[in-house]
């Protein structure tokens, strides 16, 4: 299988308006079209400060992350090697890449270089709609579930791109 089938899907939930307030990390590493690594971690956002609107979206509360590690710990232990110099996919990559950059800056971490891909730009529909259409299980606004759905969508896209072409103008 092509190296195109090697990528990392990510999703973050945030505690408040600040993009550096990641409170849950979802990461799915795909190699050769198969899941080889998963991360589903609650992380304590800076000051463990939450806004009610964010809680209403994902259901994560300050008590849930009170004893959770900081993002920097999760980054080094579970994420960095799957992001740096890799293809990174998200459903709305602009949001997730922005959160990653702001959160790493908060911790004075070096910014990774990676190639961005966006399933929202590819499919032009919301994650809930697409998950239903393609029969992908989804617990929407759970970072792990959203990252897994994104990974499955990107695999669908790659398989379509790599499908043998039938018919020819010259037949």
What is the predicted function of each stretch?
Residues 1-3, 151-171:
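Acidic two-metal-ion nuclease catalytic site recognized across multiple nuclease folds
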Residues 110-123:
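Conserved beta-strand -> loop -> alpha-helix junction used to position metal-binding or nucleic-acid-contacting
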Residues 125-159:
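Metal-dependent de-N-acetylase/amidase catalytic core
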């Amino acid at each position: 299988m092509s190296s195109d089938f090697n990528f990392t899907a990510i999703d973050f939930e945030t505690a408040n308006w600040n993009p550096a307030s990641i409170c849950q990390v979802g990461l799915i590493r795909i190699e050769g079209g198969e899941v080889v690594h998963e991360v589903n971690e609650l992380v304590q956002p800076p000051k463990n400060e939450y806004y009610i609107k964010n809680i209403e979206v994902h259901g994560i509360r300050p008590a849930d992350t009170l004893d959770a590690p900081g993002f920097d710990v999760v980054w080094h232990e579970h994420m960095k090697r799957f992001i740096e110099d890799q293809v990174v996919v998200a459903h709305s990559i602009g949001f997730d890449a922005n959160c990653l950059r702001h959160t790493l800056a908060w911790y004075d971490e070096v910014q990774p270089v990676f190639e961005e891909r966006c399933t929202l730009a590819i499919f032009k529909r919301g994650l809930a709609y697409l998950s239903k259409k393609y029969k992908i299980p989804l617990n929407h606004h759970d970072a792990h579930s959203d990252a897994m759905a994104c990974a499955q969508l990107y695999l669908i896209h790659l398989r379509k791109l790599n499908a043998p072409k039938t018919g020819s103008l010259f037949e």
